[in-house]
């Protein structure tokens, strides 16, 4: 199966959450069993009775440099199944747990996942958006003079882009971009704000990529999802060489004829041994719930991994985003997995780091991309998702605002019910 088909299937399956929600909000009709690119909101009609906003990607961080969390989500008003102009919807922090009115910045058509990092070394966090329909990565540079505002973006051609990872791939102090596109394109930053022509790392293409040192040589490697499962590309030679060994398969997706190329990957040292491990979701075979799988790096053979240990996720959750971070403040990385209607949280077992407690599931409107950040300034990290619980009608468009699951004070690692971003 081609990478294009893989990505289209993933996008189609992913849209079953936000587009189905849009149908339910827009008109007084039942929820439909099928609602994707090939079936424009079922009986909602074409175009829909009223245009609707869909939000898929999201990042959170100190974008305004005021010490508080701001939130940025993708925003697309859907008039047609494809090629709808998108925006970044920026919610600037005005204090602990307070936000200004959202500001729109034009993005590519139907933007999907976002990533953020300081790309230029100027201090403020920048944002990168992946657009499968446009076949682009769009780089938004945060103003060092007025943090939280973004000028004209840099657009990079990346056919098939569905997601992007950021990392300094050649250890030159500049952050580079790795696109989950038809070629797994590596965009090397040659000077602040300037990228070389892309290198193709894996012509078979990928639907998800992650970067991190996977063999303990101090140089980032690449993990990717293809139609079969997960492969690892280990860097070889000096950092500046940007050469990689042949891809090695480390995980095979469960057989599910309706879903291929659906693994998500995160790279982190989950057991505290100084070696990065792999955290991989799997949608599961037909009739079985999805899982998250831990592949610990083999101490005696860096760059290889032990057999996966599997943990069951909510049966109603199709995994669409993954974050590994310490959410309960015990110093051990935990796992947060977002889906169309559920967030799963797996806490690392402090008594046996690298093993995890059973997943706790939290209902959400839409968690296609999750972010971990302290939203209300209480010193506890919260879970932020692209779509909250209300959908106000604004100028004839049913809109979305991000949602947040606040961490419960006095109960580390547990979260309150979703509510709209304040």
Regions from the PLM with identified roles:
Residues 86-90, 136-139, 183-187, 229-233, ...:
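A short loop-to-beta-strand structural motif that recurs across blades of beta-propeller domains
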Residues 56-65, 112-119, 162-169, 207-214, ...:
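Beta-propeller blade termini
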Residues 71-75, 127-130, 177-180, 222-225, ...:
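Hydrophobic beta-strand segments that make up the repeating blades of beta-propeller
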Residues 1-17:
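N-terminal secretory signal peptides that target proteins for export/translocation
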Residues 31-34:
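C-terminal motif of bacterial Sec signal peptides marking the signal peptidase cleavage site
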């Amino acid at each position: 199966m081609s990478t294009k088909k893989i990505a289209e299937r993933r996008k189609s399956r992913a849209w079953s959450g936000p587009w189905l929600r849009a149908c339910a909000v827009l008109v007084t009709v039942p929820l439909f069993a099928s609602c994707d690119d090939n079936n424009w909101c079922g009986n909602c009609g074409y175009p829909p009775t009223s245009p609707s906003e869909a939000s898929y990607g999201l990042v959170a961080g100190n974008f305004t440099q005021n010490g508080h969390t701001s939130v940025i989500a993708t925003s697309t008003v859907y008039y047609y199944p494809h090629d709808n102009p998108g925006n970044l919807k920026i919610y600037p922090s005005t204090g602990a747990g307070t936000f200004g009115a959202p500001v729109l910045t034009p993005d590519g058509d139907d933007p999907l996942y976002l990533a953020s990092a300081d790309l230029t070394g100027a201090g403020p966090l920048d944002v990168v958006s992946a657009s499968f329909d446009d076949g682009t990565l769009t780089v938004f540079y945060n103003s060092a003079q007025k943090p939280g505002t973004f000028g004209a973006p840099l657009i990079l051609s990346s056919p098939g882009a569905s997601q992007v990872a950021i990392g300094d791939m050649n250890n030159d102090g500049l952050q580079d971009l790795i696109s989950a596109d038809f070629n797994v394109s590596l965009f090397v930053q040659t000077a602040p704000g300037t990228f070389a022509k892309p290198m193709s790392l894996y012509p078979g293409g990928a639907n998800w990529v992650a970067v991190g040192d996977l063999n303990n040589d101090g140089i980032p490697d690449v993990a990717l999802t293809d139609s079969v499962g997960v492969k690892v590309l280990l860097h070889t030679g000096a950092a500046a060489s940007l050469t990689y060994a042949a891809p090695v398969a480390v995980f095979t997706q469960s057989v599910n004829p309706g879903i291929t190329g659906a693994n998500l990957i995160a790279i982190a040292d989950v057991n505290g041994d100084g070696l990065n491990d792999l955290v991989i979701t799997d949608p599961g075979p037909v009739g079985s719930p999805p899982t998250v799988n831990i592949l610990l790096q083999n101490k005696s053979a860096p760059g290889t991994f032990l057999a996966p240990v599997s943990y069951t996720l909510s049966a109603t959750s199709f995994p669409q985003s993954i974050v590994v971070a310490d959410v309960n403040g015990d110093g051990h990385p935990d796992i947060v997995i977002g889906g169309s209607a559920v967030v799963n949280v797996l806490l690392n077992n402090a008594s046996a780091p690298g093993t995890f407690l059973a997943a706790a599931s939290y209902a959400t409107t839409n968690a296609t991309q999750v972010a971990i950040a302290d939203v209300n300034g209480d010193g506890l990290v919260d879970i932020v998702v692209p779509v909250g619980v209300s959908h106000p009608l604004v100028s004839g468009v049913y809109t979305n605002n991000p949602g947040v699951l606040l961490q419960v004070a006095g109960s580390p690692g547990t979260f309150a019910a979703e509510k709209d971003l304040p």
